[in-house]
Amino acid sequence: MNSKEIETFIQDVRDDISNNLEGLFSYYGFLENHNIRKIVINPNDELSFFEGTVVGMLDQRYCEFFRSKFNVDIDEIVRIDILEIIKSYLPVIRKKIS
């Protein structure tokens, strides 16, 4: 794997989130599952709890995509880039729970 392939992967992640956020919410059932989790766990900060769940699931999604594409685990630097992309969508994610 070279730097161009990694750049392409990172761009694919950006495109996936920006073009498919609604689909990701539907596919993973973020809102439906959140309603069940908050009843059982009863978090003090519901918004942070929701964001953490979404970020965790998307992080796992892209780590698995990376592994399937390159047949190696994602390195920390690329993972940080992916998490920064996910973090940039937190304002949109917050609106979903409001």
Task: Walk through the language-model features, giving the residues of each.
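Short terminal alpha-helical segments
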Residues: 1-35
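Intrinsic-disorder-associated interaction segments
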Residues: 2-6, 10, 14, 51, ...
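Generic intrinsically disordered, low-complexity segments enriched for polar/acidic and small residues
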Residues: 6, 22-27, 46-47, 59-62, ...
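Short, charged/polar, low-complexity loop and linker segments
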Residues: 35-42
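Amphipathic protein-protein interaction modules
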Residues: 42-81
